[in-house]
Every structure is written in C-alpha cells, then in structure tokens.
Amino acid sequence: MSDPAYDNQAPQEQPQQQAPEGQAVPVYEQPEAETPQAPVASESVAAQPALSEQEALYEAPELETPAQAASDNEWQDEDVSNFRPVPRVAIQAFCESESVANTIDYASRDRRMAKAHLKVQLGGVNAAVEFYQTATTPNLILVESRLIGEELMTELAKLADVCDEGTNVVVIGFKNDVALYRDLISRGVAEYLVAPISMGDIMGVITTLFVDPDSAPLGNTIAFIGSKGGVGSSTIAHNVAWAISSNYESDVVLADLDLAFGTANIDFDRDPAQGVAEAVFSSDRIDETFLDRLLEKCTDHLSLLAAPSTLDREYDFDADDFTQLLDVAQKGTPNVIVDLPHIWTGWVRKTLASADKVVITATPDLASLRNTKNLIDTLAELRPNDGKPYLVLNQCDVPKRPEISIEEFTQPLDMQPSIIIPFDPALFGLASNNGQMISETDSKSEIAATFDTFAQILTDRREIEAPSKKTMGSILSKLSRKKSK
C-alpha cells in the first residue's frame, strides 16, 4: 500500500502550486540534478549514518528559492492564520519519512510556535521508546508509524511504558480508518493524523491540546511556604525551580510574591526593571502578552517574576488580587513555582487553597512543629479533595542544637517528609553569595541530588519514598505541656 507523497516522492504530474493539499514534499524537494544548490534535507540526513535513530536530530533546510518561499506563504495563509500562539511546551517528533519531518519542522518556524520547544528526530516509535528509556518525556510526543493493527498497538504500549504522567501522544499514520482511529483514542492516544499532513494539521492538534480554552490548564502551580520565618522556604523553592527547568527542559515561571523582602532576584543574580508588582497592581491588564513583558529570563527554560524588594509603598492586597496573575501564568507555562512569604492573609490563604500542590518547609523544632500541624489541618479544610502537602525538613543536624527527631516530628503530623536537607552553611552561603543554585555551586553534592529527587517527586516522575528516619531524645512532650497551659 503505497502513497507517493507519504514516501517523499513528488508526484510527477502535480506542480508546486498544489501544496495546499497539505503535502510537505513540494516545499522541500529539489528537481534531480538540475542546479548545483546546497544539499537539501534528504542529503544532510543521509550524511549521518553513524548516528543512532534517537541521536539523529533532524535539520531542515532554509528556504532557498522563490517557489519555496511562495509555497511557504501559501501554507501560512491557508492553514495557520487563525491559530493562537502556542504556550511554553516541550514537543518532540519521531519521523520515519522526510516529508513528515519537513512539515513538522516547518511548523516549528511559525511565529505562533516561538515559545514552544520543538525537536524533530528521525526514527519512529521504536526510536522514541529507546530514547525515553534514559530521558524524561515532554508535554507532547509526535510519532510517525506505518504499522497498523496489533503491531502498532504493541509498539505504542512500549512507548506508554516509558512516558511520564501528563505526556500526550499523537500518532501519524497512513491508513485512513475510522476503526483504527477509535481504537487509538480509546487507548489514550491524543490524536491520529493521516499522512500526508500539512502544517495546519500540526498546528491544529497542538493548539487543540494546549490552547483550547475548554481544555485543562497547561501548568501546575506549586506553592511554597515556610512554617516560620527563616526556615529556608524560598531557598527550597528556587532550587526546585532550577532543578525542574534544567533536568527536564520543562519551562518554569518562578513568582516571588514576597514583594517587600523577596530574594529571588538576588539568588539568581538578576535585577529586572519590572516584575510581580507591576502585574498585581495592574491585574485588570494581565494577559499572556503583558506577562511575557514582565518575565526576566534566567535560562532557556526558567523565567523569573521578581519582587521589587523595596519599601517605598505598602503591600496590602485583597484576597483575589493574585488570582488573575496566577491563572494567566498557569495557562501558558507547564510549571509555576510560587514563593509565598511567611504571613497569613486572605490572598496567601486563597493562593494556598487554589494551588495544585503545596510544599511546607520546616525545621526540627517546636515552633515549626506546631505551625506545620496548624497549616496541614487548615489546608485539609481548604482542600478536602486534594492530597496532603509535601513536607521538607531543612537545616537538620545543626551542631550542638537539640532537635526533635524525625520520628517524633512526623508522628503528630501523620506524614513523612518528602526530603530531609542537612545543615550546610558553607555550601548554601557560597551559593547565595555567588547568586547561584546549589547544583551550580556543587553539582556532585548530596544536597544537589536531593533537590533533583524532589523535582522528580513534584513533577510526578517517581513515587514518593520516605527518607530514612533518625532517632534523638524526645522533647515532644514539651509541646503538649505548652498546649495544655
């Protein structure tokens, strides 16, 4: 069963102006042996036989002829002119034919895809399975396959085994079969496209998945709060944001909501002219475009919404003042890290209640235990249908300081800490003074590995494992006696 366009063979009787049929080939193919132009995509790909399928990143050629440029404009006007910009999502495509690879790469060049990170690689489902054995999966995987029936389902089952939660899979095949389509959708495939495909097909499926106003928000909001001042909640939030963005190449917006005393700009060695203050004081103007102007780019995948950290005005807010800001951020970014100050106001309470996940940072002392217990109980009332917050025990094993043991600390909370971070003033002090994260200062340290583990936990890339427990003298009875007074 052969399809000339799908096999990357240009139909002899069809001129290039028929490209609106959705065929990528006429845009990229060159007449054989007519002009000494630079090698096209098929030649550049063939010149890389030493690379394995998952390593062979596809590089499409630039437009070189007026005919190609005209065809490009034709596609853009007909297929994608009405599409909205795609948010900050990671997309990888595994293609068996150059025609499909060309089309997807062409779509990635469109201005509406400027925020997305799209990579095209040669190889089909098998290449994707092999690649993701040792790599995390993006927001969307596009796979091309000539298989049908049980053979296709078997290959997709292997792919499902290596996919992280929340990853969408779109299959590009060659058989126009309603039964096949229904079978794929019933097995969790987001969409099935029949080749030959157009740039409009690719843009359409991406915008349906991530831009559709009726679809679920793209990102998860993770709110960090300390059980008391000075426990290191901001430091934890900043390092986790760094770990998610660098380890998984997943876009992160870090919002420092401690407008008066926030430290995110210092920790990342940035001095943005605007940030969260402009957003919250102009909440009626907040949209994706306005938010983009306020973000300070720290890395390719990490953007900072910094606090002004000045005392030239009072920062009194209503309960709903941050709602619009966080809603807009969540619609356009896979991960929104919210660094909350240690205060208890209407807007902090509402932010915690509406967050997808909450992280409480505490130190092993009585005040932290009491406040952590109060926070957990309050969150249970505010979020009755959500899981418990994540607990981070920080600054443990301070020399000569009596501490509550991990076992005694967690017993009244009825939960285990997700991670335990030891007291290391030299490492944290050096990182802070240099405007770096822990993994930048000492990537081989156990603490850097701990932040990597927590990033995996918060992004649902592994099961939560309880850290080892330590035993020390019990002083929990002191807290009980104080409560009884």
Predicted regions and their residues:
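Walker A/P-loop phosphate-binding motif and the immediately C-terminal alpha-helix
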Residues: 220-266
